[in-house]
Amino acid sequence: MKRFLTATALLSALVLTACSDPGAGPAANAGPGEWPDPTAKLDGVELTIWAAQNSNTVPKEVVSAFEKATGASVKIDTIPDPYEQSIQTRVATGDLPDLAFWQPTASMLTAINAPSKLQSLEGAPWIDELDPALRDITGILDGTRYAALVTSPAVIGVYYNKKVFAEHGVTAPPANFAELVDLGRKLKGEGVTPFYEMGGDRWATQWAVQVQLADAVKDGFWEKLNEGKESFESPVMLDAIRTYQGMVKEGLYNDDIVTATFEDQGDALMSGKAAMVFQVNSFFGQLQAKADTAELNDTIGFFPISPSGHVGMVIPDQSNALVAFRTGDATREAAARQLLSFWMGQGYADFVADRQTVSLKSGVDSPAGVPQALLDVHASLPDSVGSMQALAVANPDLYINLADMLAGEMTPEEVASTTQDQFEQLAKAAGK
């Protein structure tokens, strides 16, 4: 399950980070370190990786291979949810791991105070081996690389039931968002629930709104928002919120939208109870727990959508990337870089095979067992634009405010104004 920090929790964590003892760690803004040979001996060196409940198995096999190759000892600690807040609280008190899974977006790198807390990964030896479209897609703050992308980042788009489409004569994805809504109306008229929303768990309510911003994002919407030249009350955002509400009021969503859960949404799409959902990669992970690759390939498809065409929105999460902390111990810091170099170098082919995940490297093929929908998600990355989480300097509670709108507790205008107020508070706390 995907979780997001609330604005209140993130604001508290930002204040903690800002108030942490500057003498507890190394000086800020150190340059990149040397990159050791990936299999250089590390007998007696102990490293710690912090991971969330949904990422703690990701490094298991590659870490084991690294230990055998180098003699190092690597411990994987599972940090309780809310993961990001728990880490920020511990980091603020000087409790640092060697590496951690971390959302590699500008806002979350800012939240962890990357320039003073994280090692620079500039000059990493595997970067040139990555698919050119992915090299600089995330993990960079103010021109410095702080995060190593290890798995394909999530994309906001539409997952659909292929069998429902076929039964109703839909032979190709709609050409744009307006045609998507028209398709929803057609399906509703034929007795199908067009879209399914999980308003009870709330966090996915933002996806139908964000995809409507893709064209504006191409024109610099998030950058303008960061500079105060646009806001969450700007017409493009307010219109997207109103359109979402209009689709709900028109009956294009499930009747239990206010209480439906993440699990309900997965069940509805797999069974054909609903035709489509706006979602990200973690949703497909749920489906993989319900069906094997053959059934998924027969049943579930994916397409990106935007006002003018098929443009997705990138939203990398913590399971996609790792950061290396500046612990003040030069040996461990170098060993952490060495582990990343091993992981993304000679250990990468075995890693993607073990995880049955899409390869990020041009010279490493994706495993045969990766479902087609995930390959389609990955293929959409080169033409995708950044989400709010990826490019805004702060991430307010848009999803909570939208869920409140679904429950009749907010108007679109109140959603926009409340979200803007939260954004300004968070940006100020982050020093932006």
Q: Could you tell me what each predicted segment is?
A:
Residues 93, 168, 250, 289-354:
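Extracytoplasmic/periplasmic substrate-recognition and gating elements
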Residues 166, 349-350, 362, 378-432:
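Conserved C-terminal helix/tail region of periplasmic/extracytoplasmic solute-binding proteins
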Residues 1-46, 424-432:
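Short, low-complexity disordered leader/linker segments with a strong preference
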Residues 33-41, 105-156, 208, 301-302:
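Hinge/lid segment of periplasmic solute-binding proteins
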Residues 227-257:
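Glycine-centered hinge/linker elements that transmit conformational signals in sensory
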